[in-house]
Curated annotation (Swiss-Prot):
SUPFAM superfamilies: Osmotin, thaumatin-like protein. This is Thaumatin-like protein 6. It comes from the Eukaryota. Belongs to the thaumatin family. The lineage of its organism: Eukaryota, Viridiplantae, Streptophyta, Embryophyta, Tracheophyta. Induction: By phytoplasma infection. Disulfide bonds: none annotated. It comes from Glebionis coronaria (Crown daisy).
Amino acid sequence: AIFTIRNNXQQTVXAGAVPVGGGQXLDXGQTXTLD
């Protein structure tokens, strides 16, 4: 499965809700893809 996380908010968010993501931070508009 492929999971795409996008931060649509104005602030930086941590993608810590996804264990595989390792809690990386996403700036506004950034995406992270996990497979």
